[in-house]
From Swiss-Prot:
This is Protein PET100 homolog, mitochondrial. It comes from Bos taurus. Interacts with COX7A2. It is a single-pass membrane protein. The gene is PET100. InterPro entries: Pet100. One of its GO terms (molecular function) is unfolded protein binding. PANTHER family: PROTEIN PET100 HOMOLOG, MITOCHONDRIAL.
């Protein structure tokens, strides 16, 4: 009984990961479940949203540069 049980357990231990890798590497499954879900959670950015974000980053960068420049001019 013990040897048969160990053989069964080892079969399960080896079969489960192989089956999971086989299922996960199916192109159709990946497209249906992963890519589609990703698009639902994080939709593609709109051009005007991206442009606003870039403008905001540029304003913040300029403010930091001006602050550093003022600090450098006032320093020793």
């Amino acid at each position: 009984m013990g040897v048969k049980l160990e053989v069964f357990r080892m079969t399960i231990y080896l079969t489960f990961p192989v089956a999971m890798f086989w299922i996960a590497n199916q192109a159709e499954w990946f497209e249906d479940y992963v890519i589609q879900r990703k698009r639902e959670l994080w939709p593609p950015e709109k051009e005007d949203q991206r442009r606003e974000l870039e403008e905001f980053k540029e304003r913040i960068r300029k403010q930091r540069e001006e602050k550093l420049l003022r600090a450098a001019q006032q320093g020793p």
